């Protein structure tokens, strides 16, 4: 496993992000998903984020990515949702017929940390530190 680093730290931070279309409307197809993925990659460069995996269903996307410890996740996610919403509606006008208001994405999102050792292994390791 290769760790990432910067001037003051060594890290390996993987995140699993799930973004849902407003009202769970069935709007995603392969073309729109590829378009949204390209936007994610372009914007992520400014936030020290690297895309690892992307997949979609008709009403949501799953995104696995790596980030630096100083990355402002909420700021990045909101910037992505705002930009992608605007550009998807512009370049895929058929989407407007399926959504009642201006927003493309649901207001909420699911962000999970992932990778590394299972939680039970880490918990046991921490519990046993005082025994050494």
PLM feature spans:
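Basic nucleic-acid-binding interfaces
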Residues: 1-132
């Amino acid at each position: 496993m290769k760790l990432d680093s910067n001037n003051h730290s060594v890290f390996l931070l993987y995140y699993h992000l799930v973004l849902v279309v407003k009202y769970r409307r069935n709007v995603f197809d392969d073309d729109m998903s590829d378009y949204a993925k390209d936007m994610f990659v372009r914007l992520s460069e400014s936030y020290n984020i690297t895309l690892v995996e992307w997949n979609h269903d008709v009403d949501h996307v799953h995104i696995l990515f790596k980030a630096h410890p100083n990355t402002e996740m909420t700021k990045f996610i909101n910037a992505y949702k705002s930009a992608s919403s605007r550009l998807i509606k512009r370049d895929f006008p058929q989407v407007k017929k399926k959504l009642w208001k201006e927003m493309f994405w649901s207001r909420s999102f699911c962000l999970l940390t992932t990778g590394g050792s299972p939680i039970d292994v880490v918990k046991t390791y921490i519990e046993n530190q005082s025994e050494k």
